[in-house]
Amino acid sequence: MPLVRVPATTANLGPGFDTLGMALNLFDELKIEESSSPEIIITGEGEGTIPRGQENIAYRAARAVFAKVGRPPVPLKLEMHNSIPVARGLGSSAAALVGAIVGTNAILGGPLGPAELVNLATTLEGHPDNVAPAILGGLVASARDGEQVICRRLELPPGLVTVVAIPQFTLSTRISRGVLPAKVDLEDAVFNISRVAVLLAAVATGDLDLMGRMMVDKLHQPYRLPLIPGMAEVFAAAREAGALAVTLSGSGPTVIAFCRGRQPKVGPAMAAAFARKGVKCTVKELAPCNHGAVVI
């Protein structure tokens, strides 16, 4: 019975919309085995809300592996223990399907390599920015090339620490994407493209200050501002308290601050800014995770 540990992920990192993602040191665990009948057991985050039938995203992902390798599907038992908050912008759905894909691949003897796992996970998730770092770890830049996803992984600079402020309310990716415009100004597109390029160079050279300066965005965060009460105030509070950069984590509502080493004032400042807008949140300090999903 494979036990798979899958990291949380934060996507976009400011300018890298649907392109950049990073693994974080917070994990979901999934056990998977063949069974006489389908069974899904869920504990932890989402225990009372995540579907337990065969429509469950992890169960569907497991069956997709059988189809991918040309094997007839068999009933499966999945035991999921979730520590990643659901629908908060920390890659909970990516973790579920990646855990199932990696675990099923292990059951079948490992016929799929990392690139094939990323491609299958992207097909199921719809975009690679969470699933790629969940599989590969570190910071991953991804691009679609026809039917293929091209990924390159970077080790994260030592000394980087993140602080996440996780509001108690959920925000679905569907709603968060629904507020985005179909077209953007050329000037805004160039603004983001240039910053993604320099951001990746900063990561590669370990320049945390430059990395922080480049984590700004004009393509998605301004449009999502009305969906998250206090977002602008939380950004400002985190920077004032010592963060190098602050961005939305994925499509939100979680806000993530990037810091040089531990900055004990950042988390309380973010929580206080949310509280002033009537939003309760949980604050966690999370190290970047340089490994992806692992079979234990």
UniProtKB/Swiss-Prot annotation:
> Which protein is depicted?
Homoserine kinase
Which species is listed as the source? Moorella thermoacetica (strain ATCC 39073 / JCM 9320)
Instruction: Look at the named UniProt entry and state the broad enzyme category this protein falls under.
Output: transferase
Family note: Belongs to the GHMP kinase family. Homoserine kinase subfamily.
**Which EC number(s) does UniProt give?**
2.7.1.39
**Recorded catalytic activity of this chain's protein:** L-homoserine + ATP = O-phospho-L-homoserine + ADP + H(+)
List where in the cell it is found: Cytoplasm
Gene label: thrB
Q: Which PROSITE patterns match?
A: GHMP_KINASES_ATP
